[in-house]
Amino acid sequence: MTATAPVTAATAPTPEATLAPAAPVATTLPLSPPANLRDLGGIAIAGGSTRAEFAWRADDLSVIDDASATRLMSAGLSTVIDLRSIAETEITGRGLLGAYPVAYHHVPFMASISSAVDHVADPSEMWDQSRFAQMYISLFENAAPQIVTAMAVIAHAPGAAVFHCAAGQDRTGVLAAALLLAVGADSDAIVTDYAETGHNIAAVSVR
């Protein structure tokens, strides 16, 4: 594991740091496993688009195979941000990427998966998609320090960064939304990126 210097929100980059002339970019990397990994490059923002390979979002990277890990490294990966709880990381670990020279940052957005249930009146409602918006708002509020930390890590990464949770949908989706909002993406672009997970979630679920 490569050590990294402490980072703070105060030194986060301006939106211009990720601007590039708009150009078609394939936003989904053909890597499996994981099943929900994609580049956040090529997303329209004011003045251009996000730079390809500055950040990826993903589902559980502990399942990555050697060929996929090698390809990520070849694409400039320098930093992994793990949003899972301590219990989740103890079950599956870091996977093969743990053997590569990348900085690893564990920034758990929840103390445990069960803590997500604590913020809804009826735990069964947690899986009601009509209530996802409220769940994400609660996650923004309760994990605000972690969101700031993760964004600062991405800003100061010497190469590309990838952040992930277990399915790459909720915690990862919240961080992706915060990141895209910070660099100037509009709500439609953020929702479009989030919706891409819908095409991949079945493969994540069967795994």
Annotate the PLM regions.
Residues A167-T172:
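Ser/Thr-glycine-rich phosphate-binding loops at phosphate-binding pockets of nucleotides
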Residues H164:
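Short beta-strand segments
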Residues M1-A161, L175-R207:
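Cys-dependent protein tyrosine phosphatase-like superfamily
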